[in-house]
Amino acid sequence: MFTAIWVMVGLAIAIGLILGWSAIRFKVEGNPLAEKIDAILPQTQCGQCGFPGCRPYAEAIAKGEADINQCPPGGEEGVKKLAELLGVEPKPLDEAHGTPKPKSVAFIDEQTCIGCTLCIQACPVDAISGAAKQMHTIIADECTGCELCLAPCPVDCISMVPIAEDLPHWKWKHPVVMMKQVGESTRV
């Protein structure tokens, strides 16, 4: 009996070592530039740029197949960050892909919702919870404001509500300078 256990343990260790070696040996390297570009994009997965999501758009920019000014949710600020990363001149946002809008989240009127689940299927980030024939709810922290859930709704119970700029959603608009850096630069 102990022989069978030791054989199984030995096989498990051998297979584990082979799999570990294979993972290191045949590791697929991603494009580091595409990963940096993807980190700058807003991750709304809205498709307004003409690509199915932010990652494919980042890969197309890295390959030179797409321009840096096709992301309306990223706005002019996103275009400037991409231009800085790639070392090119910033361009105005391409209006053919849409215009920047204030940040907003979807809101479902639960009294009108019929529970058809079409909005759940359309949401690229799974920000809608609910079941068939029951009312649905938006998970506001997950919603990216892509508006892809609006069109499939047969009863138009979904609306976009701007995010209030209160304390939890407030963002400092100016560059952050660390006090330690300021103190070091003023020393003689």
UniProtKB/Swiss-Prot annotation:
Annotated residues for binding of [4Fe-4S] cluster 2: 113, 116, 119, 153
Single GO biological process annotation from the record: electron transport chain
Cofactor(s) the protein requires to work: [4Fe-4S] cluster
Binding sites annotated in the UniProt record for [4Fe-4S] cluster 3: 123, 143, 146, 149
Residue ranges occupied by any 4Fe-4S ferredoxin-type domain in the UniProt entry: 104-133, 134-163
InterPro entries named among the record's database cross-references: 4Fe-4S_dom (IPR007202), 4Fe4S_Fe-S-bd (IPR017896), 4Fe4S_Fe_S_CS (IPR017900), Elect_transpt_cplx_RnfB/RsxB (IPR010207), RnfB/RsxB_Proteobac (IPR016463), RnfB_subfamily (IPR050294)
Domain 4Fe-4S: 29-88
Cofactor note: Binds 3 [4Fe-4S] clusters.
Cellular compartments annotated: Cell inner membrane
Main location: membrane
SUPFAM superfamilies documented for this protein: 4Fe-4S ferredoxins
Gene Ontology cellular-component annotations: plasma membrane
Residues bound to [4Fe-4S] cluster 1: 46, 49, 54, 71
Subunit relationships: The complex is composed of six subunits: RnfA, RnfB, RnfC, RnfD, RnfE and RnfG.
Role description: Part of a membrane-bound complex that couples electron transfer with translocation of ions across the membrane.
Family the entry assigns: Belongs to the 4Fe4S bacterial-type ferredoxin family. RnfB subfamily.
Protein name listed in UniProt: Ion-translocating oxidoreductase complex subunit B
Organism: Thiobacillus denitrificans (strain ATCC 25259 / T1)
Gene that this sequence comes from: rnfB
